[in-house]
């Protein structure tokens, strides 16, 4: 798919894309208790999660999920490009007992499994440290010690796994990256009857009394941020509906404050994110280690600021769908933006954004970044269907917001 974008003023009302983080967690929750996800719009990654729970023994009828029998581990599981589903599923498989070959697409085959292999050493074996790999064995005790720097998703997976078997303890070896996603998992499960506490670098999972989840999948701030930044750079005003109220911990919702710090009017009221453009934007310095998915969103506004933007905590960007340190920088450069990076940071300078052409490196957020830049000066994006990984309505929504977009 080729998308051609002409300069446009983005404004109006739009529903936030459904949260991939919440969507996958709520689908996996059906392993613990039945779920009815009223407004579920499956993206590629959510479809992977649905397929996994079905193969483990959950009955799925439309948006209704119910576990009707003992869970089983199949001989083969395919995870597409969904790293979240993969990393949360391996701990679950390990407590059930597993003799399964797991695989994924070319992007997932590049993702390391080192932390989970080390954590399960002595109980569960892996035939390879990269996909495809065969996993065999069963966790011998309801305790695990795992490095926290590779991915918080393994830790979320163990929270689910120990909730499934009546309790357990997780000791995290610092540093702990993306801690906000661990808080998200704990808060979600505790709201549904879980009994989970985090003290320092330890998580204690006690037997829970889980209740069915019947409700909506909340909106995703990180995905919605590209609508917001498109409006900001083009001089518009936008209301993004169906977002969750801001919790008392940092996370993807922190983008609301980051855009405010950069000079835009940005706030949440009554489950709506209201964003208005500003005559002047300014650069910020931000560490994204706890919310790496916000790096492309921040980068989308940075060239239009009056001072440089410095993005730190970028280590985990290198093992996303693409090496985002490189692909963010290359994408900005193709639109005439001055950008520099090293091992520790990306520096984006105020620049005159020009029309650009990007071939999506099979990374949804890079295509979304390119779209924001294009609304200012025009641009074309090849392989634009990559947005389906997280938000299949992306281009349709932007057209509804006055985006002058031609899809070929």
Swiss-Prot record:
The keyword Cytoplasm applies. It holds the Pfam family EPSP_synthase. It is an enzyme of class 2 (transferase). Keywords: Amino-acid biosynthesis, Aromatic amino acid biosynthesis, Cytoplasm, Transferase. PROSITE patterns: EPSP_SYNTHASE_2. Its EC number is 2.5.1.19. Pathway: Metabolic intermediate biosynthesis; chorismate biosynthesis. 3-phosphoshikimate binds at residues 20-21, 25, 151-153, 178, 293, 320. Disulfide bonds: none annotated. Belongs to the EPSP synthase family. PANTHER family: AROM/DEHYDROQUINATE SYNTHASE, PENTAFUNCTIONAL AROM POLYPEPTIDE. Catalyzes the transfer of the enolpyruvyl moiety of phosphoenolpyruvate (PEP) to the 5-hydroxyl of shikimate-3-phosphate (S3P) to produce enolpyruvyl shikimate-3-phosphate and inorganic phosphate. This is 3-phosphoshikimate 1-carboxyvinyltransferase. It comes from Sulfurisphaera tokodaii (strain DSM 16993 / JCM 10545 / NBRC 100140 / 7). The lineage of its organism: Archaea, Thermoproteota, Thermoprotei, Sulfolobales, Sulfolobaceae.
């Amino acid at each position: 798919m080729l998308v051609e974008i002409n300069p446009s003023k983005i404004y109006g009302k739009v529903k936030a894309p459904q949260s991939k983080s919440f969507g996958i967690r709520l689908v996996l929750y059906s392993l613990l208790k039945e779920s009815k996800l009223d407004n579920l719009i499956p993206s590629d990654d959510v479809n992977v999660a649905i397929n996994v729970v079905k193969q483990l023994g959950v009955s799925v009828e439309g948006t209704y999920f119910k576990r009707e029998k003992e869970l089983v581990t199949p001989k083969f599981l395919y995870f597409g490009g969904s790293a979240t589903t993969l990393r949360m599923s391996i701990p679950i498989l390990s407590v059930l007992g597993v003799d399964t070959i797991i695989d994924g697409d070319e992007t997932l085959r590049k993702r390391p499994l080192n932390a989970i292999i080390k954590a399960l050493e002595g109980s569960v074996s892996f035939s390879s440290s990269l996909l495809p790999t065969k996993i065999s064995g069963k966790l011998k005790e309801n305790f695990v010690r795992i490095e926290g720097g590779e991915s918080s998703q393994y830790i979320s997976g163990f929270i689910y796994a120990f909730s499934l078997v009546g309790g357990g303890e997780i000791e995290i070896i610092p540093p702990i990256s993306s801690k906000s996603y661990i808080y998200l998992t704990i808060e979600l499960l505790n709201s549904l009857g879980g009994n989970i506490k985090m003290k320092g670098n330890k998580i204690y999972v006690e037997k829970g009394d889980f209740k069915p989840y019947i409700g909506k999948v909340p909106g995703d701030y990180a995905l919605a941020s590209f609508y917001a930044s498109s409006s900001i750079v083009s001089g518009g005003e936008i209301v993004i509906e169906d977002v969750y109220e801001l919790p008392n911990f940092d996370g993807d919702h922190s983008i609301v404050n980051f855009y405010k710090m950069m000079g835009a009017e940005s706030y949440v009221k009554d489950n709506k994110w209201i964003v208005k453009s500003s005559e002047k934007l300014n650069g910020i310095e931000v560490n994204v280690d706890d919310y790496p998915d916000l790096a492309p969103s921040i980068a989308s506004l940075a060239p239009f600021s009056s001072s440089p933007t410095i993005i730190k905590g970028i280590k985990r960007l290198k093992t996303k769908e693409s090496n985002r340190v490189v692909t963010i920088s290359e994408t900005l450069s193709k639109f005439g933006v001055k950008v520099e990076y090293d091992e520790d940071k990306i520096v984006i300078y105020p620049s005159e954004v020009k029309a650009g052409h990007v071939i999506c490196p099979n990374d949804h957020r890079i295509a979304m970044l390119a779209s924001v830049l294009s609304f200012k000066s025009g641009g074309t994006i090849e392989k634009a269907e990559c947005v389906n990984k997280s938000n299949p309505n992306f281009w349709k929504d932007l057209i509804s917001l006055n985006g002058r977009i031609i899809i070929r």
